[in-house]
Design a protein with these regions (language model features):
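TM-adjacent membrane-interface loops and short helices in multi-pass inner/ER membrane proteins
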Residues: 252-300, 311-315
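N-terminal membrane topogenic signal
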Residues: 1-18
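Hydrophobic alpha-helical transmembrane segments of multi-pass inner membrane proteins, especially
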Residues: 14-30, 34-262, 305, 309-365, ...
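A juxtamembrane structural motif centered on a specific transmembrane helix
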Residues: 1, 360-405
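Transmembrane helix boundary and interhelical junction motifs in multipass membrane proteins
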Residues: 155-160, 282-287, 298-300, 371, ...
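Proline- and acidic/polar-enriched loop/turn elements at helix boundaries
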Residues: 32, 182, 285-286, 320, ...
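Helix-boundary and loop/linker segments of multi-pass membrane transporters
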Residues: 5-6, 136, 292-295, 337-338
């Protein structure tokens, strides 16, 4: 029996994701211990049960069929993103959800998976090379299509996740250093511009030198450098066109202390909660910041505060360790499967989870602006939990069929 399980199930991915889900349920219960939010825990429990069904279904899904439907599934997800723009429910300024009674479904969560599958299907073709500008352009189009629709909602946080996933797949696909730098440079210039003229000029100078040293063609290098500069200069115009709540999130990221009772409140309280946990924490259901509701809706964006405050460094480190086990195993799986398609899918799904973890915990620690990115397996949210379960199921499927070409 044990040998059968080891042959067909990746225990490291399975156990780590199971433990993270349990920690998530425990944390959501604590964060919603107040009777006013008591139904949230039971909803999350119901989504966990549904997630188990989704995980099993994806783990048993015919492997060959998975690749066959990759592009059609991606096209269907694009259709859903268009429909949600027209008929979806607007929450916190974003038209991202379909209402299903007392539950809401967010199509962009599932579009992440179909985008990974579609991009993996394209990159695994024998006639595709990322050193060919045409192939690179088409690969970028697969990612930019859903990103453009998501930005129209607008949902910047979800759109950012696609960037991390796409970068990992392009890197895994053998893109040159210059190509990778071409992807990073505009983003670096944009971030530098947010901090002011001097940081922007420093980024432009450093990236300019790197672009020159890695250039494959002078004209292309000049175009990349120009795009980087234009993106950086355009940031201020984009900022001026943002909605007030989006501007506040960026301002809070740059200086949380400037408005400690307003826009910066959540980040400051989050840092207090995590920092006050000490080594072993204050005890379950005894966190002052979490139990006294100092952090609004802490069961979503700031769920990491709960284990950090109530179980201290040990609790926070345990969560990080479990994520490390999951992510390292995902990369290992990507390097060991025989199929090129399976390898791309594994690295794409792993990178998607990794980007979520990196940004969410960065938000909780005040290292990133609050952009509404949930912590996988822990944060409250049905769409997020179902998509996480689907990703685990697909990884299990790849492990079972790891010797297939």
């Amino acid at each position: 029996m044990l040998n059968y399980i080891q042959r067909h199930f990746d225990l490291q991915i399975g156990i780590s994701s199971l433990l993270l889900t349990i920690i998530g349920l425990v944390s959501v219960y604590s964060a919603t211990y107040d009777a006013r939010a008591s139904d949230i825990f039971f909803k999350q429990l119901a989504w966990s049960g549904a997630g188990t069904v989704v995980l099993i279904a994806m783990a048993l899904f015919p492997y060959r069929l998975l690749q066959t439907i990759s592009i059609p599934a991606w096209l269907f997800s694009l259709l859903l993103l268009v429909i949600v723009l027209l008929l979806g429910k607007t929450v916190s300024g974003s038209t991202s959800w379909f209402n299903l009674g007392s539950f809401r479904i967010q199509p962009s969560e599932f579009a992440k998976i179909t985008t990974v599958l579609a991009l993996a299907s394209y990159l695994s073709r024998s006639d595709v090379s990322l050193r060919n500008p045409r192939d690179l352009f088409l690969a970028g189009g697969i990612v930019l299509a859903p990103v453009a629709l998501i930005m129209m909602q607008p949902d910047f946080g979800t759109a950012v996740i696609y960037g991390g996933m796409a970068f990992a797949l392009i890197y895994w696909g053998g893109a040159s250093q210059f190509t990778l730098l071409s992807v990073v440079a505009p983003a670096a210039a944009a971030v530098g511009a947010l901090f002011g003229t001097t940081p922007f000029l420093i980024v432009v100078a450093v990236m300019g030198v790197l672009i020159y040293l890695t250039k494959e063609h002078r004209l292309v290098a000049a175009v990349v450098f120009s795009v980087m500069v234009v993106v950086g200069i355009s940031v201020q115009f984009i900022y001026d066109g943002m909605k007030p709540y989006q501007q506040k999130r960026i301002d809070t990221f740059l200086d949380p202390g400037a408005d400690p009772l307003g826009a910066g409140y959540n980040i400051l309280q989050s840092k207090v909660a995590i920092g006050s946990g000490g080594m072993f924490g204050k005890g379950y259901l005894h966190g002052s910041q979490t139990q006294l509701n100092f952090i609004p809706e802490q069961w979503t964006d700031f769920i990491f505060c709960v284990p950090g405050e109530e179980f201290g460094f040990i609790g926070a480190a345990t969560v990080l360790l479990l994520f490390a086990v999951f992510l390292l195993r995902g990369v290992t799986l990507a390097s060991k499967v025989k199929s090129k398609y399976a390898s791309f899918v594994a690295i794409g799904l792993t990178a998607t989870i990794a980007t979520h973890v990196f940004i969410n915990i960065g938000m909780a620690l005040g290292l990133f602006p609050v952009i509404g990115v949930p912590l996988p397996f822990l944060s409250y949210g049905g769409s997020s939990l179902l998509s996480n379960a689907a990703m685990v199921g697909i990884l299990m499927n790849l492990y079972t069929n790891r010797k297939e070409y």
